[in-house]
A protein has these predicted regions:
Chain C
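Post-cleavage N-terminal segment of exported redox proteins
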Residues: 2-54, 82, 92-157, 183, ...
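N-terminal, post-signal-peptide region of Sec/Tat-exported proteins
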Residues: 46-79
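Conserved short C-terminal alpha-helix that flanks the catalytic cleft of nucleotide-sugar-dependent
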Residues: 62, 162-163
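Short coil/turn and helix-start
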Residues: 67-68, 168, 229
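Non-catalytic, surface-exposed connector residues within folded enzymatic/regulatory domains
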Residues: 70, 122-125, 171, 232
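The canonical Cys-X-X-Cys-His
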Residues: 70-80, 131, 159, 170-181, ...
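Short cysteine/histidine-rich zinc-coordinating motifs and their immediately flanking basic loops
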Residues: 84-91, 186-192
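An amphipathic alpha-helical core segment
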Residues: 175-209
Length: 147, 106, 258
């Protein structure tokens, strides 16, 4: 745990950048392009729920839900979540069908730093929908000695 | 040893939508973290989580190192008929865990 | 020890230091109350609280025979739901025939060595934490109730002295943060009142379960003090003091903390 240090006094916490392994907004855009190709993405129908203040980036509860009747004729086929600053841009990709009845997925993710999160849903008509959220991550105080 | 906690209703009305929640013990080691000697700890993650209802796949999720340790997943399913929900986690180092819950649909 | 003022020298750290604690109404706050809604929900929902994975593991160890005595915890203690109910709420305590107090994991290890004739479980090992979580979980919802054993007083007083003594390169005492500045932000983090209500806790920072000792070590490292050796008596003394300070507060094990 040398990465982050507890410094009272200056109230500063040093974050050493992860260097070349870091995802970037460009890497995220590229990962999104791999999923949507040239299709348009409409910012609608998707809700991305994250706590307003993240107390520890190691475990951040997240729920993605999509407005959809979830019928055989009209349902959400896939939900993807991406991030900008973790080492890799992909967080998860899930496949759904009318058998799910409701297009909502909850999980917990790691966020190394404050950043933008994007969720993209693909509906059965081949269209893409999205939502994004800017999250602020607090770094923990009182950490371990180097392990 | 498999260590899993699954939360699903034991009974459900036919056609209703039920929530299934699953928690599994796993380090989700990213493969980007330095260990004691400054050497990178090798990646060890769950790559995939799938769910079946009486054998038919109803949910499939590809995970990444950005999923938190001891992964938690919740999703929904239509209670179509009584049966077994099968949950399966697979990942690095040959990790395979399966868990089943029975839901009675009336 | 509810001094009204603290030295002005402390201003380097906290703009205005002030003892907020008052005698009278119970204003004590568990660390749970300092967390956001999402983490409170994670703690309260047994199928979402990752600490419950360890409780489940502990229930398996409880029934597993070990050591040359070839006995499981259950062979002697039966159903933990009855035999272990309230136990975590009154530790640390002095075992029969002993002179010094042990904390809950110390007590479990005593049963390992003396009753199961097995090797001690290493500190912070998964199996020890799981057993501790399983035992502590049986006291969830019960008030912290330190035993009325006068032999404990001297140890508790030593714990209180440690709590109030300045130490480390930052020259801070536990009390300066946890009594005088509890509720304030330190580098974005709310300073809790340091009540041992949730232990062992699933700390998100650790991404696993950990003991109160580990939590205390983190604070010692935070103020750049040399942490006590992993099984030093100072931890048990501090735990005795903290449990007494939290007397009557409800146990929440396994807690979730950031």
């Amino acid at each position: 745990m040398d990465r982050r240090r507890f410094l009272v006094g200056t109230a500063a916490i040093v974050v050493v950048p992860l260097g070349s392994a870091s995802a970037t907004p460009e890497a995220m855009a590229e990962a999104i392009r791999k999923v949507v190709g040239d299709s348009a993405v409409t910012e609608s129908r998707v809700t991305l729920d994250l706590p307003p203040l993240i107390e520890n980036g190691n475990t951040v509860p997240l729920v993605v839900s999509v407005e959809s009747p979830m019928t055989v004729a009209d349902h959400v086929k896939a939900i993807h979540v991406f991030n900008e600053k973790n080492p890799q841009p992909n967080v998860f990709s899930a496949r759904l069908s009318a058998r799910n009845g409701r297009a909502a997925i909850g999980t917990r993710i790691k966020l190394g730093d404050s950043q933008k999160i994007v969720a993209i849903a693909e509906t059965s008509d081949g269209r893409f929908w999205s939502a994004s959220a800017d999250v602020i991550v607090t770094l923990a105080a009182c950490l371990e000695e180097s392990t | 040893m498999a260590n899993v906690l699954v939360n699903a209703p034991k009974t459900a009305k036919r056609g209703s939508v039920v929530e299934i929640k699953a928690l599994i013990m796993h380090p989700m080691e990213t493969g980007f973290r330095p260990g004691t000697m400054g050497k990178i700890i090798p990646r060890n993650i769950i790559e995939r989580f799938t769910a079946t209802w009486n054998g038919t796949e109803i949910f499939d999720m590809e995970m990444s190192p950005a999923i938190a340790a001891n992964p938690f997943v919740s999703f929904f399913a239509v209670a179509s008929e009584s049966g077994t929900v099968g949950l399966r986690w697979t990942g690095d180092e040959g990790f395979v865990v399966e868990e089943r819950v029975v839901i009675a649909v009336e | 020890m509810r001094a009204l003022h603290f030295g002005i020298g402390l201003a380097i750290i906290f703009a205005a230091s002030w003892a907020a604690a008052q005698v009278g109404a119970d204003k004590r706050r568990s660390g749970t109350q300092d967390m956001g809604e999402a983490l409170q929900k994670m703690q309260d929902d047994d199928t979402a609280n990752p600490g419950m994975l360890f409780v489940q593991l502990g229930s398996q160890s409880w029934a597993k025979k070990a050591g040359t005595a070839d006995k499981s915890c259950a062979d002697c203690h039966g159903n933990a739901g009855t035999s272990m109910k309230g136990v975590a709420a009154r530790y640390p305590a002095i075992p029969k025939g002993a002179e010094a107090p042990v904390d809950l994991d110390g007590r479990i290890n005593l049963c390992r060595t003396e009753n199961q004739k097995a090797e001690r479980l290493p500190p912070e090992s998964r199996e020890l934490l799981a057993l501790e979580a399983y035992v502590a979980h049986q006291s969830r919802g019960l008030p912290i109730a330190p035993p009325a054993d006068p032999r404990l007083d001297a140890f508790r007083d030593q714990g209180a002295a440690i709590y109030r003594a300045r130490q480390g390169q930052l020259n801070l005492s536990c009390a300066i943060c946890h009594d005088d500045n509890a509720g304030r932000k330190l580098a974005g983090v709310t300073i809790p009142e340091a009540h041992p209500t949730g232990y062992p806790i699933y700390r998100l920072e650790w991404q696993t379960l950990g003991s109160l000792k580990r939590r205390l070590r983190n604070c010692l490292v935070g103020i750049r003090a040399e942490p006590y050796a992993s099984e030093a008596p100072e931890y048990v003394m501090l735990e005795l003091f903290l449990m007494d300070r939290a007397k009557g507060m409800v146990l929440e094990a396994p807690g979730v903390r950031p």
